[in-house]
UniProtKB/Swiss-Prot annotation:
GO BP annotation list: adaptive immune response; blood coagulation; innate immune response
Main location: secreted
Species: Sus scrofa
Subcellular location: Secreted
Gene symbol of the encoding locus: FGA
Complexes and interactors: Heterohexamer; disulfide linked. Contains 2 sets of 3 non-identical chains (alpha, beta and gamma). The 2 heterotrimers are in head to head conformation with the N-termini in a small central domain.
Free-text comment about domains: A long coiled coil structure formed by 3 polypeptide chains connects the central nodule to the C-terminal domains (distal nodules). The long C-terminal ends of the alpha chains fold back, contributing a fourth strand to the coiled coil structure.
Post-translational modification: Conversion of fibrinogen to fibrin is triggered by thrombin, which cleaves fibrinopeptides A and B from alpha and beta chains, and thus exposes the N-terminal polymerization sites responsible for the formation of the soft clot. The soft clot is converted into the hard clot by factor XIIIA which catalyzes the epsilon-(gamma-glutamyl)lysine cross-linking between gamma chains (stronger) and between alpha chains (weaker) of different monomers. Forms F13A-mediated cross-links between a glutamine and the epsilon-amino group of a lysine residue, forming fibronectin-fibrinogen heteropolymers.
Source domain of life: Eukaryota
This protein's record includes keyword Nucleus: no
Protein known as: Fibrinogen alpha chain
One Gene Ontology CC term in the entry: extracellular region
Record function comment: Cleaved by the protease thrombin to yield monomers which, together with fibrinogen beta (FGB) and fibrinogen gamma (FGG), polymerize to form an insoluble fibrin matrix. Fibrin has a major function in hemostasis as one of the primary components of blood clots. In addition, functions during the early stages of wound repair to stabilize the lesion and guide cell migration during re-epithelialization. Was originally thought to be essential for platelet aggregation, based on in vitro studies using anticoagulated blood.
Alphabetical keyword list: Adaptive immunity, Blood coagulation, Coiled coil, Disulfide bond, Hemostasis, Immunity, Innate immunity, Secreted
Amino acid sequence: AEVQDKGEFLAEGGGVR
């Protein structure tokens, strides 16, 4: 759960979105 592209990493719990 790292800052990949947007703030959706914390919402999705995934990778690059």
